[in-house]
Structure formats: structure tokens, C-alpha cells
């Protein structure tokens, strides 16, 4: 592993050791915690290791990582990160900017392979009647337009909100799916994506 940096060697060995000992790989966040780096930093190390030929990722398998060098006898298949889970989304910044990313999460293959896919953690009960609960992970495909009736993520005054989209003659109407709450009517909402899936951890 002469072409890997010392940190990259440690990351590669940590993944291999974890799979051998536990039967499953560490998460991006666990890699970051292990080495005192951010989730994005851990992800960057994985991509650098891939470029040097030690691992191969497969986009149609939620970024499965196959170890190629020095591990042929183990034939390990490591499922690592899937899509970025965003924290606060700031107006004016690229939606997938590094500072927005909290960690990477694995999701079903048919969702992870869609271009521009990211995840947001649902806060509150404004969409509960649509089966979307507080704490759920909303899987979003990046888009700046929407059709009436689609569930979208819209940015309003630096706050991301998940609502049902409707276009009115002179404004946008964002409807909750909670009878206790009123629709939001605004001219200043920015559509950043539409809901394509929901991920719930029990």
C-alpha cells in the first residue's frame, strides 16, 4: 500500500477489520469518529482510496465497495455510504455543499441511483396525514420545478419545509397534510427537490 497515505491505510484497514470482526462495515460517521474527522472527510478518504485502485464502488448497489488489493482471499463486499443526509439548508448555497452534509446514509438501490438524490430528516407533524412522521428520513431528488400535487422541499427564508406544492396565478401554495395547520402562500419560496421516497428506522 505504498501509494496510500498513512491515514488512508488506516481507513482501509479499519473497514476490513470491522467487516471481519462484526460481519458488517462501519458507517461513514463511525469511520469519522474513529479517526476524528467529519463524515465528509471520511467519504473523501474512501473516494481517494478508490481512485488509487484499492476499492471499486458500484453505483447500482448503494455505493457498494469491493476491496481489490491485498484482500482477494477475503472477497469482501462492503456497503458504505448511500446518499448525503443534509442538516440545515442555507439560501444561496449549493444544496449539496459540504457544510450542509451531516453524514451519508444507505438507502435502497432504486433510490440511491437517481441523480441528485439527497435526504432530509423530517421535523414536526405537518405531513402526518400523508404518512410522513417526525424523525422520518425524506428521500429527495433535486429539482427546481414541481407539478401541482407533488410533495416538495421548499426553501422559505432559510428554512426548508416539506409540503404539497400548488401553483397559483400570482404565488405558490404549500399545503401541509395536517388538518390543524394552514397552507403557506408565498411568492418567495424556492423549490429545491421533490419527495421520491421515505426511510424510517424502527
UniProtKB/Swiss-Prot annotation:
GO-annotated molecular function: DNA binding; serine-type endopeptidase activity
Catalytic activity reported: Hydrolysis of Ala-|-Gly bond in repressor LexA
Keyword Lipoprotein: no
Residue numbers marked as site, Cleavage: 91-92
Active site positions: 126, 163
Ranges annotated as DNA-binding: 28-47
Keyword set, alphabetical order: Autocatalytic cleavage, DNA damage, DNA repair, DNA replication, DNA-binding, Hydrolase, Repressor, SOS response, Transcription, Transcription regulation
Paired cysteines (S-S): none
GO-annotated biological processes: DNA repair; DNA replication; negative regulation of DNA-templated transcription; proteolysis; SOS response
Residue runs in coiled coils: none
Broad EC category: hydrolase
Enzyme Commission no: 3.4.21.88
Function: Represses a number of genes involved in the response to DNA damage (SOS response), including recA and lexA. In the presence of single-stranded DNA, RecA interacts with LexA causing an autocatalytic cleavage which disrupts the DNA-binding part of LexA, leading to derepression of the SOS regulon and eventually DNA repair.
Quaternary structure note: Homodimer.
Xref: NCBIfam families: lexA
Family membership noted in the UniProt record: Belongs to the peptidase S24 family.
Name listed for the protein in its UniProt record: LexA repressor
Species name: Leptospira biflexa serovar Patoc (strain Patoc 1 / ATCC 23582 / Paris)
Amino acid at each position: 500500500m505504498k501509494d496510500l497515505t498513512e491515514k488512508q491505510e488506516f481507513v482501509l484497514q479499519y473497514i476490513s477489520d470491522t467487516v471481519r470482526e462484526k460481519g458488517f462495515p462501519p458507517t461513514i460517521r463511525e469511520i469519522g469518529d474513529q479517526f476524528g474527522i467529519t463524515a465528509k472527510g471520511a467519504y473523501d478518504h474512501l473516494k481517494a482510496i478508490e481512485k488509487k485502485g484499492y476499492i471499486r464502488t458500484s453505483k447500482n448497489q448503494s455505493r457498494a465497495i469491493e476491496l481489490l488489493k491485498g484482500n482477494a482471499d477475503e472477497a469482501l463486499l462492503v456497503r458504505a455510504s448511500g446518499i448525503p443526509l443534509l442538516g440545515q439548508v442555507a439560501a444561496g448555497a449549493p444544496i449539496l455543499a459540504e457544510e450542509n452534509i451531516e453524514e451519508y446514509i444507505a438507502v435502497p438501490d432504486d433510490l440511491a441511483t437517481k441523480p441528485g438524490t439527497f435526504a432530509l430528516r423530517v421535523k414536526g407533524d405537518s405531513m402526518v396525514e400523508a404518512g410522513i412522521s417526525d424523525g422520518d428520513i425524506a428521500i429527495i431528488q433535486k429539482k427546481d420545478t414541481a407539478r401541482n400535487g407533488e410533495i416538495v422541499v421548499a426553501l422559505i427564508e432559510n428554512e426548508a419545509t416539506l409540503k404539497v406544492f400548488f401553483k397559483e396565478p400570482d404565488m405558490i401554495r404549500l399545503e401541509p397534510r395536517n388538518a390543524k395547520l394552514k397552507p403557506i402562500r408565498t411568492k418567495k419560496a424556492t423549490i429545491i427537490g421533490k419527495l421520491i421516497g421515505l426511510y424510517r428506522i424502527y
